[in-house]
């Protein structure tokens, strides 16, 4: 019997093992020099002046919203087609999430939906670069500038993604994820990039107890002594063990993403003979990171529901994912916003399915998936 094929698997090798050993041998395993190396390397990738490594992208979103002063009564616009952590952070700060619809075919938040949701209480806009493709940043930043509203890019899916020749994040502030299924991973982790030095300083303080110094001081070889708390903060710093793995992964990013793109191209070719509908690509110039390959399973077209397809693939030893069940349909948000309807988000939320896609996926793995899809479709 064939081994179970997961929908994602991290691409780890000798380089990551060596990186971990180096940190263990150094005697300094928590936040230290590897964090600074990672931040500098990520700035070279995105073109930003500052990067702040954190324990997760969720942590990064939390302190980014705090650094903007988001609080009681404020509104933050974001799509419902996202992971709920963004909504949770908004709510936990006492603010109100304003969830908007997305384009039916790309699942990207549109500037039209954003602008329609802007009120005098709007204090931030959070577009999501979905599945590895970029949102329409020119139009979204134009809205931010017109109304004086900061934009924070949710780039959890977008390490390696470019929009009109520039890496995601280069326009301002963006938050990336190093979670286990992401394009590069260190098990858990994230990074915030920005060109605003005051904003970066706030992030560094908030991620480490609100202290007026970073978690690591290059000159003293540790944390500066007698540091004072400037404001209450959190314990969101990234250990060097994780940072070292992320660095090793970052050095492989081009190769990892090239393999993802090759598999995605094979999927697109194979879908021509199947009833399942992949997402459309954005019309603007971009480089897709192919974090996810998503199909829509419409029962009227496919003869099967999404949930039944996922269950059938599981019986054949093939894993899938759901990215995402729309946030406003989750119990807490459904009860808090009982009248909210987002037609294109809801249509997709009931039909989307993420197929296996990861750099170490073999040709035989790919053939298994396509053969199974043909069998399920009755072909």
From Swiss-Prot:
Q: Which NCBIfam families match?
A: PRK11658.1 (NF008658)
* EC number, as in UniProt: 2.6.1.87
UniProt keyword Lipid biosynthesis present: yes
Gene Ontology terms: cellular component: membrane
Question: Could you say which enzyme class this protein belongs to?
Answer: transferase
**Gene Ontology biological process terms in this record:** lipid A biosynthetic process; lipopolysaccharide biosynthetic process; response to antibiotic
> GO MF annotations for this entry?
pyridoxal phosphate binding; UDP-4-amino-4-deoxy-L-arabinose aminotransferase
UniProt keyword annotation of Ligase present: no
Protein family: Belongs to the DegT/DnrJ/EryC1 family. ArnB subfamily.
Protein name as it appears in the record: UDP-4-amino-4-deoxy-L-arabinose--oxoglutarate aminotransferase
Pathway this chain belongs to: Nucleotide-sugar biosynthesis; UDP-4-deoxy-4-formamido-beta-L-arabinose biosynthesis; UDP-4-deoxy-4-formamido-beta-L-arabinose from UDP-alpha-D-glucuronate: step 2/3; Bacterial outer membrane biogenesis; lipopolysaccharide biosynthesis
Q: Gene of origin? A: arnB
Q: Which UniProt keywords apply?
A: Aminotransferase, Antibiotic resistance, Lipid A biosynthesis, Lipid biosynthesis, Lipid metabolism, Lipopolysaccharide biosynthesis, Pyridoxal phosphate, Transferase
Coiled-coil residue windows: none
- What HAMAP family does the database record attribute to this sequence? ArnB_transfer (MF_01167)
Kindly give the InterPro entries that the UniProt entry links to this protein.
Answer: ArnB_NH2Trfase (IPR022850), DegT/StrS_aminotransferase (IPR000653), PyrdxlP-dep_Trfase (IPR015424), PyrdxlP-dep_Trfase_major (IPR015421), PyrdxlP-dep_Trfase_small (IPR015422)
Pfam families assigned: DegT_DnrJ_EryC1
Cofactor(s) recorded for this entry are:
pyridoxal 5'-phosphate
Recorded catalytic reaction(s): these are: UDP-4-amino-4-deoxy-beta-L-arabinose + 2-oxoglutarate = UDP-beta-L-threo-pentopyranos-4-ulose + L-glutamate
């Amino acid at each position: 019997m064939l081994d179970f094929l997961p929908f994602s698997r991290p691409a780890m090798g000798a380089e990551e093992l060596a990186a971990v050993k180096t940190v263990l041998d150094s005697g300094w395993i928590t936040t230290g020099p590897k964090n600074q190396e990672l931040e500098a390397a990520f700035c070279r990738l995105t073109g930003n002046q500052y990067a702040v490594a954190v324990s997760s992208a969720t942590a990064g979103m939390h302190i980014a919203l705090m650094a903007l002063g988001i609080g009681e009564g404020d509104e933050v616009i974001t799509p419902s087609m996202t992971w709920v952590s963004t909504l949770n952070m908004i709510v936990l700060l006492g603010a109100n999430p304003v969830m908007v619809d997305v384009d039916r075919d790309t699942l990207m938040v549109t500037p039209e939906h954003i602008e329609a949701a802007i009120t005098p209480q709007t204090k931030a806009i959070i577009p999501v670069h979905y599945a590895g493709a970029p949102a329409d940043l020119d139009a979204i930043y134009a809205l931010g500038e017109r109304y004086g509203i900061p934009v924070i890019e949710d780039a959890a899916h977008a390490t390696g993604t470019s929009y009109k020749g520039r890496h995601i994040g280069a326009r301002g502030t963006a938050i990336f994820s190093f979670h286990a299924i992401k394009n590069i991973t260190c098990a858990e982790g994230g990074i915030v990039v920005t060109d605003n030095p005051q904003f970066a300083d706030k992030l560094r303080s908030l991620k480490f107890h609100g202290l007026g110094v970073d978690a690591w001081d290059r000159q003293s070889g540790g944390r500066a002594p007698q540091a004072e708390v400037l404001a209450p903060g959190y314990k969101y710093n990234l250990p060097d063990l994780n940072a070292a793995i992320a660095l090793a992964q970052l050095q492989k990013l081009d190769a990892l993403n090239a393999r993802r793109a090759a598999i995605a191209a094979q999927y697109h070719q194979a879908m021509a003979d199947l009833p399942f509908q992949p997402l459309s690509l954005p019309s603007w110039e971009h480089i897709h990171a192919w974090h996810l390959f998503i199909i829509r399973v419409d029962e009227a077209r496919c003869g099967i529901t999404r949930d039944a397809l996922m269950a059938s693939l599981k019986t054949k030893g093939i894993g899938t994912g759901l990215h995402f069940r729309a946030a406003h349909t989750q119990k807490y948000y459904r009860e808090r916003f009982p009248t909210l309807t987002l037609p294109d988000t809801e249509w997709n939320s009931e039909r989307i399915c993420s197929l296996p896609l990861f750099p170490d996926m073999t040709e035989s793995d790919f053939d298994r998936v396509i053969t199974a899809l043909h069998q399920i479709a009755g072909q």
